[in-house]
């Protein structure tokens, strides 16, 4: 059974291109990844966004372990951005990146990027993270 999560999807849609990082938080296995990688991804495709302008990285996937290095993930993302059109960057379990707040701050400097992240542990949910973006 698929739970549509219309309310949360609408929150993401209404926050598109606002020059802020959109953060989806919650306990593990609560549907954050499904919301971003399926529901929001499908919305982007349905509204005309090209697949190659959606950069999705699941950092809890062992195959992406090398991308947990801040320099490696930033280089990977920059290599995928090849034109001036808007790119949607979706990072799942972002707290698995070393120095993830520095990475997120760096992503804010990409003019043609709209950034969405999820996280689920106490390190990511800490109020201290919020102060990093003031």
Kindly give the residue locations of the regions a language model identified.
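Phosphate-binding site recognition
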Residues: 1-134
């Amino acid at each position: 059974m698929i739970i549509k999560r219309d309310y949360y999807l609408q929150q993401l849609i209404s926050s598109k291109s606002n020059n802020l990082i959109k953060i989806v938080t919650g306990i593990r296995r609560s549907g954050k990844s499904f919301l971003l990688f399926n529901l929001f991804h499908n919305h982007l495709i349905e509204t005309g966004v090209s697949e190659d302008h959606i950069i999705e990285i699941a950092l809890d996937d062992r195959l992406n372990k090398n991308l947990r290095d801040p320099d490696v993930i930033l280089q990977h993302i920059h290599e995928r951005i090849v034109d001036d059109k808007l790119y949607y960057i979706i990072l799942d379990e972002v707290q698995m990146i070393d120095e993830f707040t520095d990475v997120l701050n760096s992503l804010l400097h990409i003019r043609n990027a709209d950034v969405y992240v999820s996280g689920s542990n106490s390190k990511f949910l800490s109020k201290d993270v919020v102060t990093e973006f003031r």
